Swiss-Prot record:
This is Glycine cleavage system H protein. Binds 1 lipoyl cofactor covalently. It comes from Xanthomonas oryzae pv. oryzae (strain KACC10331 / KXO85). InterPro entries: 2-oxoA_DH_lipoyl-BS, Biotin_lipoyl, GCV_H, GCV_H/Fam206, GCV_H_sub, Single_hybrid_motif. The keyword tRNA-binding does not apply. HAMAP family: GcvH.
């Protein structure tokens, strides 16, 4: 299993959130999630300007096996999307925590970040899933 970056927060549904220096939140799916899905063939991105709600579907990733909603870890407004994923969805498979980010949110309430799992708690969740 790959290393879980220490600067990320997670949802139990395997999305990650990186708090940027400008207060925005970058969102993607975990390396564990992309591994379960297999080779990704399509990503449905949210629109810039869309309002997303914590825990609601904001994007969709599709593999040869299944389509899966990507839930937003925070509420706010989408300010940027990774349009490169339209042509290269496999970027998520190759670099889930880096170039494979999906969208960026201007967060409504920073307190929501306190409800997310830290990397150690997320690693524990993955271990529990395997047993």
């Amino acid at each position: 299993m790959s290393e879980i970056p220490g600067d990320l927060k997670f949802l139990k549904s395997h999305e990650w959130a990186r708090i940027e220096s400008n207060g925005r939140v970058t969102v993607g799916i975990s390396d564990h999630a992309q591994g379960l899905l297999g080779d990704l063939v399509y990503v449905e991105l949210p629109g810039v300007g869309d309002t997303v709600q914590v825990g609601n579907g904001a994007a969709v990733v599709e593999s040869v096996k299944a389509a899966s909603d990507v839930y937003s870890p925070v509420s706010g407004t989408v300010v940027e999307v990774n349009s490169a994923l339209s042509d290269k969805p496999e970027t998520i498979n190759e670099d889930a925590y880096g170039e494979g980010w999906i969208f960026v949110v201007e967060i409504d309430d920073k307190e929501q970040l306190n409800d997310l799992l830290d990397p150690d708690d997320y690693a524990e969740l993955l271990e529990d899933d395997e047993h």
